[in-house]
């Protein structure tokens, strides 16, 4: 059958379950735009910037492991998308990117045969060989140089994006091939055998029994659960086996929504900007079962030799390189798919008797949660001028129903959000922890909302971050998405303000906002009203509660600005400590700032403290 190549691409996506596409149209992708935009099984959301399209596609895939395609044009269309793609790469999110390219006979790649080996930058108008830029941030990146290879490259790209450790793939299609016709019956296909040979083997029974025995005999075991559990499709198995193991569960940023706060097994969030209970569990543990978490530098801290120093670590990961990092000690590396491992662990664990009998240890973790909450009583007190950002995040999240949707931007939104947000049963929170780009919140909320069936979605944004993708306020309205935008206004780039306060006390501030005199922000009331949003704001905790309740009760999108204190520090957090003699040290993760009295900290420890010298 003869078919236009672009229609073949659209049919391929629909046949593989894709229902949504994010795009900014362009001349270099004209036939792709036409085919995707008119396909009966595909809905295209048109953004105002390709970075927003890429971030929306990334956040979309987080909700249910379902891919939304991303279509961009040649030249700046592709380069604009890079931040969203690298975010997906570092957080292992599947993404399927199709870009337009200039006519193949006007590419530098084609012209290379005439230049006697001399490099040529470009030939075509707006030409750029995007695959050279995206190769390090994708599992597969190719320019289609032969139209008859379209089936092969589509099948290979899809397989690699969704198999093993997920990630982005990118197919660059010259515009003359997009509009050309192919004979679909004779197209060669892709055989995944060679690529699949690099996948981990099935988990064997000996490994499962080893893990169960270690847990049975551990006095202070911890289940360190990561986002790879969801990526593998192993969430149901995780919930089932967690009940059987009966050990404290610790999460971190990408994985905070694996378990609700009120679950008796949930202990806390570990890492350099986690909480005290989560870090105390990890630091006191004698056994850590880490599944689907790469245990990043944020989780072990910069004094990583003191991380989990009394624990025997079992790490289950689909990427062997992650278990060999110099920042970790892994006594029992298990190269495996998280779903396969969890299902076999669940099948082998006794259904009625908990594997672990360390009830006192679990009770200790629950005591820590009660005695050392993420939001402190003083943060609920009024200061006369602003709301408290910790109180705001806690109150907002506590008012949400089960199965709610939230997208979190970076800066205050992600730091406080991941410390103080109340995870309700079935709730989802999308945030990008690895690249952590400003501008994430609005487009991530768009992707989250669409993936979640266009249900009400909370967007936590910052006054600095929102400026990076402000134009997406219109995309929300155009598509009638019920997104509640809560803007944390801390008068600029607050995380950088804190860094400058800590490191450059003798210098004036630079580049952070009005106080540095070189960067300013608009009145967001005027911005919201110009776009057509109902606007409200709060300058106190009492006002904050009122505007949160009103926004959640309102129909459709809303814009709420929460003014917060520019002196607010992130707490608790890993921080350099100055000793009485002036020496600067990096404490281990059990010792977070604001620092507790040494005697109080020692009472929480089952192992010796690290000497302060």
PLM feature spans:
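N-terminal alpha/beta PP-like core and its mobile active-site loop of ThDP/TPP-dependent enzymes
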Residues: 1-356, 399, 482-485, 505-506, ...
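Active-site nucleophile and cofactor-binding loops and adjacent substrate-binding regions
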Residues: 24-26, 45-55, 70-77, 145-146, ...
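N-terminal cationic-hydrophobic initiation segments that often serve targeting/anchoring roles
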Residues: 61, 161, 242, 397, ...
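Thiamine diphosphate
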Residues: 108-125, 272, 323-326, 333-335, ...
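Conserved short loop/turn motifs at secondary-structure junctions
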Residues: 226-231, 381-382, 462
């Amino acid at each position: 059958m003869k078919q236009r190549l672009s229609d073949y691409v659209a049919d391929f996506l629909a046949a593989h379950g894709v229902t949504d596409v994010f795009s900014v149209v362009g001349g270099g992708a004209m036939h792709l735009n036409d085919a995707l935009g008119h396909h009966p099984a595909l809905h295209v959301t048109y953004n105002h910037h390709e970075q927003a399209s890429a971030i929306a596609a990334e956040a979309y895939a987080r909700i249910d492991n379902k891919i939304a395609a991303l279509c961009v044009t040649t030249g700046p269309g592709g380069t604009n998308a890079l931040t969203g793609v690298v975010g997906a790469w570092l957080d292992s999110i599947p993404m399927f990117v199709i870009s337009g390219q200039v006519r193949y006979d006007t590419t530098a790649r084609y012209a290379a045969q005439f230049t006697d080996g001399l490099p040529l930058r470009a030939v075509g108008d707006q030409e750029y060989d995007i695959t050279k830029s995206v190769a390090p941030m994708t599992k597969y990146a190719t320019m289609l140089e032969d139209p008859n290879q379209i089936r092969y490259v589509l099948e290979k790209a899809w397989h690699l994006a969704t198999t093993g450790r997920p990630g982005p793939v990118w197919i660059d299609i010259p515009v003359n091939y997009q509009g050309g016709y192919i004979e679909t019956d004779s197209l060669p296909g892709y055989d995944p055998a060679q690529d699949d040979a690099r996948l981990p083997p099935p988990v064997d029974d000996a490994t499962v029994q080893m893990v169960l025995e270690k847990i049975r005999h551990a006095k202070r075991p911890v289940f360190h659960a990561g986002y790879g559990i969801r990526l593998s499709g192993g969430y149901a198995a995780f919930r089932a086996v967690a009940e059987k193991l009966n050990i404290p569960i610790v999460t971190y940023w990408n994985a905070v929504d694996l378990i609700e706060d009120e679950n008796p097994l949930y202990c806390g969030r570990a890492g350099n900007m986690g909480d005290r209970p989560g870090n105390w569990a990890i630091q006191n543990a004698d056994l850590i079962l880490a599944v689907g978490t790469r245990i990043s530098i944020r989780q072990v801290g910069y004094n990583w030799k003191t991380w989990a120093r009394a624990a025997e670590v079992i790490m289950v990961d689909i990427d062997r390189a992650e278990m060999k990092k110099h920042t970790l000690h892994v006594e029992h590396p298990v190269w495996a798919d998280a779903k396969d491992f969890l299902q076999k662990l669940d099948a082998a664990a006794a259904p009625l008797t908990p594997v672990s009998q360390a009830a006192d240890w679990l009770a200790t973790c629950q005591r820590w949660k009660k005695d050392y909450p993420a939001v402190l009583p003083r943060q609920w007190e009024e200061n006369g001028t602003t709301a408290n950002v910790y109180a705001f995040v806690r109150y907002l999240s506590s008012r949400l129903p089960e199965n709610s949707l939230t997208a979190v931007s970076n800066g205050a939104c992600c730091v406080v959000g991941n410390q103080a947000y109340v995870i309700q049963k079935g709730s989802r929170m999308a945030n990008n922890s690895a690249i952590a780009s400003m501008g994430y919140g609005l487009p991530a909320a768009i992707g989250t909302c669409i993936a979640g069936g266009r249900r009400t979605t909370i967007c936590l944004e910052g006054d600095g971050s929102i400026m990076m993708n402000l134009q997406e306020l219109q995309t929300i309205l155009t598509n009638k998405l019920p997104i509640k935008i809560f803007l944390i206004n801390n008068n600029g780039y607050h995380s950088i303000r804190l860094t400058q306060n800590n490191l450059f006390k003798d210098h004036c501030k630079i580049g952070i906002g009005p106080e540095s005199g070189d960067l300013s922000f608009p009145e967001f009331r005027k911005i919201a009203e110009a776009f057509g949003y109902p606007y409200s704001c709060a300058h106190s905790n009492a006002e904050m509660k009122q505007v949160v309740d009103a926004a959640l009760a309102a129909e459709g999108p809303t814009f709420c600005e929460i003014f917060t204190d520019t002196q607010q520090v992130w707490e608790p957090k890993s921080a350099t400590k100055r000793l009485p003699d002036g020496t600067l040290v990096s404490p281990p993760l059990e010792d977070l700032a604001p620092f507790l009295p040494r005697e109080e900290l020692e009472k929480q420890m089952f192992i010796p403290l690290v000497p302060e010298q």
